[in-house]
């Protein structure tokens, strides 16, 4: 049901993560190539082997979160399953926030220097904020789904 506020939060979060994944993938991989070549990681193959699956997971995590948020909109009649899917996407989104902090800590200055215009640099800074906004939206949707479920349960008790 799209008229419910939690569905709008989930749809907005899904859209933001899809845009984040689609437009940011090229710059994301560019930043990971920079992180792999940092001086304190040079010659340490074990850390590089750890980074390779991390690169794969974090490049497709926004797409996964986007799909989960979109799918959970259609579980409006099965609230427990909707809450479960939202919680999974919330935890993935929280991990994405931690990864964003770690990623941009090492590569922000380099990526900002690669941006061809000031507009693209502003878009880079918006990409930093995007996972945090989406995490808040997913949290709010979980809160409103629980509130909706409590309302339905209280009406069932009255009958």
Language-model features and meaning:
Residues 15-31:
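Alpha-helical transmembrane segments of multi-pass membrane proteins
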Residues 30-41, 105-114:
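Peri-membrane helix termini and adjoining interfacial loops of integral membrane proteins
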Residues 71-94, 152-159:
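Cytoplasmic juxtamembrane regions at transmembrane-helix boundaries
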Residues 97-159:
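Alpha-helical transmembrane segments of multi-pass integral membrane proteins
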């Amino acid at each position: 049901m799209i008229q419910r506020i939690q569905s709008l939060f989930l749809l907005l979060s899904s859209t933001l993560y899809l845009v984040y994944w689609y437009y940011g993938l090229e710059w994301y991989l560019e930043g990971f190539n920079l992180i792999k070549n940092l001086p304190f990681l040079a010659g340490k193959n074990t850390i590089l082997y750890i980074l390779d699956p991390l690169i794969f997971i974090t490049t497709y995590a926004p797409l996964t979160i986007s799909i989960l948020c979109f799918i959970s909109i259609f579980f409006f009649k099965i609230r427990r399953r909707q809450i479960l899917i939202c919680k999974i996407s919330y935890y993935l989104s929280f991990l994405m926030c931690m990864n964003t902090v770690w990623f941009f800590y090492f590569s922000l200055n380099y990526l900002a220097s690669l941006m061809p215009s000031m507009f693209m640099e502003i878009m880079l800074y918006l990409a930093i904020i995007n996972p945090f906004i989406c995490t808040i939206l997913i949290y709010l949707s979980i809160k409103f789904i629980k509130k909706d479920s409590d309302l339905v349960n209280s009406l069932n008790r009255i009958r």
